[in-house]
Regions:
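Long, low-complexity serine/threonine/glycine- and acidic-rich segments characteristic of extracellular
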Residues: 45-51, 74-80, 88-167, 188-189, ...
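N-terminal secretory signal peptides that target proteins for export/translocation
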Residues: 1-13
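Short, compositionally biased P/S/T/A/G/V-rich stretches that sit at domain boundaries
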Residues: 36-70, 164-193
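Boundary at the C-terminal end of the N-terminal hydrophobic targeting segment
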Residues: 29-36
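Bacterial N-terminal signal peptides
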Residues: 14-27
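A residue-level signal for beta-strand positions that form part of recognition/binding surfaces
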Residues: 21, 57, 96, 180, ...
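Intrinsic disorder/low-complexity segments enriched in polar/small residues
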Residues: 4-5, 33, 129
Length: 280
């Protein structure tokens, strides 16, 4: 009998038990470290929607590495290849955002994230946070977690920023502004090659996968209008906050709406964005 087989027999009662034990060990080891494998996208069913060239990840849409800011300020969250759903709700691989302040990623991705000032939970499906920190350097991270606050391997790069001044007596409403939705990119007037990314944002609204029908939540709907053809309607019922598109060449008007997950009404409408799509 080969030496390796003898060692296996000495460690377990049978070859089957050995292989089962080995599989469990490998699975546990894999679960402890973030995966570098590209996640299969959960895409809305439309022929113009294409998979993201990026892996599933969180990111800040309005903050820059090395940026200097006065507080309070608004941090806006972006998410690739996943959707949002409030805490306590299950919808595929959707989750909710967490903002980590001066904290590394957890060592154990199988334990719930703590609740404190350095692990801030956005369990309603929010896409932004009002951040009010004293002057100094900070490292910010985004981390997506499931219904029980157990993190996915979906997170942002660490973002190093400096707070230069903390303004006192500032009301949250004056910083946050009125509730609205926006197309963050592309900008109106841009001419793009395919595929291109369209980023959505909701201020003052909670985003969710439509399936759980959570009250006070909604999802994005994008209508693409082109002269001489019927409008194309893309429903992001999975709670997605961005998409990659490959439409036919031409000029388009993008109209983004926020749709209630309980009654299907239009809760908010963004300013239209006019773009051109050309060949490479």
């Amino acid at each position: 009998m080969p030496k390796k087989t003898l060692l296996a027999v000495n460690c377990v009662s049978s070859r089957v038990a050995f292989l089962s034990s080995l599989a469990l060990t490998c699975a546990a080891a894999f679960a402890q470290a973030p995966s570098a494998t590209t996640t299969v996208a959960e895409l809305p069913p439309h022929p113009w929607v294409v998979p993201s060239p990026r892996e599933a990840q969180g990111y800040f849409t309005n903050l820059k590495e090395g940026g200097v800011y006065e507080s309070p300020f608004v941090a806006r969250f972006g998410l690739s290849m996943r959707g949002l759903v409030p805490a306590g709700q299950t919808a595929g691989r959707a989750g909710h955002h967490h903002l980590l302040i001066n904290q590394p990623l957890p060592l154990d991705f199988k334990k719930p994230l703590p609740f404190n000032d350095q692990y801030i939970h956005f369990g309603k499906g929010q896409m932004q946070a009002l951040v009010d920190l004293p002057p100094g350097p900070y490292v910010l991270r985004l981390l997506l977690a499931d219904q029980g606050h157990i993190p996915y391997f979906v997170y942002s790069k660490p973002l190093n920023i400096t707070i230069s001044k903390q303004n006192k007596g500032v009301t949250p409403a004056s910083v946050l502004g009125a509730p609205e939705i926006q197309v963050l990119s592309p900008a109106s007037g841009e001419v793009l090659t395919v595929p291109f990314r369209v980023q959505f944002h909701a201020s003052g609204y909670n985003v969710s996968n439509a399936s759980p029908k959570v009250p006070n939540t909604g999802h994005f709907r994008l209508t693409m209008e082109r002269a001489g053809t019927k409008s194309e309607v893309l429903n992001f019922t999975g709670g997605e906050t961005e998409t990659w598109l490959k439409p036919p060449l031409g000029d388009y008007k993008l109209q983004l709406e926020f749709i209630s997950n309980t009654d299907g009404s239009v809760t908010s409408k963004a300013k239209p964005v006019a773009i051109g799509v050309k060949g490479r």
